[in-house]
């Protein structure tokens, strides 16, 4: 199990990303469409003035059962250990142990 403080930090980041998503997208679109270098510099400063944790690439994929940050399968949102144990118990519909 991951530390509760790390899980809480990640939840806080997700909320910030949601709150600033529209503003961040509009600034980035304006930055891409701007031709004048001074205008681009001004828009870039506005983007930098946003909170650091509102960038979506700072969110960490975590297992929803244990909170582990590594070995997480996107399709299930589970870490590899939980995926294996839940698949063996039949808790994941459609997942079967392979044999050939």
Curated annotation (Swiss-Prot):
InterPro entries the record matches: Ribosomal_uS14, Ribosomal_uS14_bac/plastid, Ribosomal_uS14_CS
One Pfam family in the UniProt entry: Ribosomal_S14
Keyword Amino-acid biosynthesis: no
GO MF, any single term: structural constituent of ribosome
Signal peptide: none
Function text: Binds 16S rRNA, required for the assembly of 30S particles and may also be responsible for determining the conformation of the 16S rRNA at the A site.
Subunit structure and binding partners: Part of the 30S ribosomal subunit. Contacts proteins S3 and S10.
Name of the molecule in the record: Small ribosomal subunit protein uS14
Source organism: Prochlorococcus marinus (strain NATL1A)
Gene assigned in the entry: rpsN
């Amino acid at each position: 199990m991951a530390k509760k403080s790390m899980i809480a930090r990640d939840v806080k980041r997700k909320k910030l990303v949601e709150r600033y998503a529209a503003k961040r997208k509009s600034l980035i679109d304006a930055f891409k469409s701007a031709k004048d270098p001074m205008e681009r510099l001004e828009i870039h400063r506005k983007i930098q003035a946003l909170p650091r944790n509102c960038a979506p690439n700072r969110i960490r994929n975590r297992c929803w059962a244990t909170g582990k940050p590594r070995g997480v399968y996107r399709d299930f949102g589970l870490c590899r250990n939980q995926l294996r144990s839940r698949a063996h118990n039949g808790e994941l519909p459609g997942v079967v142990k392979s044999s050939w």
